[in-house]
Swiss-Prot record:
It is found in: Nucleus. CDD domains: Ubl_ubiquitin_like. The lineage of its organism: Eukaryota, Viridiplantae, Streptophyta, Embryophyta, Tracheophyta. PROSITE patterns: UBIQUITIN_2. This is Ubiquitin domain-containing protein 7SL RNA1. The gene is 7SL1. It comes from Arabidopsis thaliana (Mouse-ear cress).
């Protein structure tokens, strides 16, 4: 059967594998096809590195599954700890990307990922918010320790003072300097499908993204929000967020929009799960 191999450069190719093959045998076929030594290959499926001695069935590698191929560079003993941590961030982003199986979305995300990887060594932005600003007539919902606001698209926000100026021009470096709280900021959550509202959520930069998912589930339980029946991703700038990492680690900034996207599952996986 055929499986697809995505590379770090955004290109893809396919190989034919047999039912009982191990991961090592798959790598040997890649070496024969692409000329990449087995010792330099690292294969990922759904964000997990594959072990050479395990079989493809152990990882549920099915017809037209997509694997991510990372070519391991030669070790550099002089590499700084900072560069090592940044490389780990890149790897985790690529692993999260593997969770989306739809080919059209994969190509789109690959292009965005390339830009994010190119800029990963830039300094992280400052995250802060003077106060949570919401529309004058919006419904305010208290979720956990934060205040969230559900905003209709035609309503006007009521703001005042310095915080109003900060939101008016969030890209201005001068405005960023006058923000007082470096730990908290506001993200805008775009609901699923045809819900045209926008939910403003104040988050802590050091909180893991999975905390936002928990709050959204609570809102659904109260009948305030509709989430996909299937599994879903939280996506920012067209790239899935690593939910076990913080907003700061994911490079989510004040005023960014986070979308709720249904996770697509290959049809063959659904058939296999019912057998």
């Amino acid at each position: 059967m055929n499986v697809y191999i995505d590379t770090e450069t955004g290109s893809s190719f396919s190989i034919t594998i047999d039912f009982g093959e191990t991961v090592l045998e798959i790598k040997e076929k890649i070496e024969k096809s692409q000329g990449i030594p087995v010792s330099k290959q690292i294969l990922y499926l759904d964000g997990k590195a594959l072990e050479d001695d395990l079989h493809k069935i152990d990882y549920m590698i099915l017809f037209e599954s997509r694997l991510l191929l990372r070519i391991s560079p030669d070790a550099d003993p002089n590499q700084s700890n900072e560069q090592t941590e940044q490389s780990k961030q890149i790897d985790d982003k690529k692993q999260e990307f593997c969770g989306i199986q739809d080919s059209s979305e994969s190509k789109k995300i690959t292009r965005v990922m390339a830009r994010r990887v190119h800029n990963i060594y830039s300094s992280l932005p400052a995250y802060s918010l003077d106060e949570l600003l919401g529309p004058k007539y919006s419904a305010t919902v208290a979720v956990g320790g934060r205040t969230n606001q559900v905003v209709q698209p035609t309503e006007q926000a009521s703001t005042s003072g310095t915080a109003k100026e900060v939101l008016r021009d969030s890209d201005s470096p001068v405005e960023k300097k006058i923000k007082t709280n470096p730990m908290k900021f506001t993200v805008h959550v775009k609901p699923y499908q045809e819900d045209t509202r926008m939910i403003h959520v104040e988050v802590n930069a050091d909180d893991n993204v999975e905390e936002l998912r928990k709050e959204l589930v609570k809102m659904q339980e109260r009948g305030e929000l509709n989430l996909p029946h299937e599994a879903f991703h939280l996506v920012s700038s067209e790239l899935p967020l690593t939910e076990t990492k913080s907003f700061k680690w994911n490079r989510v900034a004040d005023g960014d929009t986070i979308e709720i996207i249904r996770r697509l599952v290959p049809f063959c996986s659904l058939l296999f799960s019912h057998t």
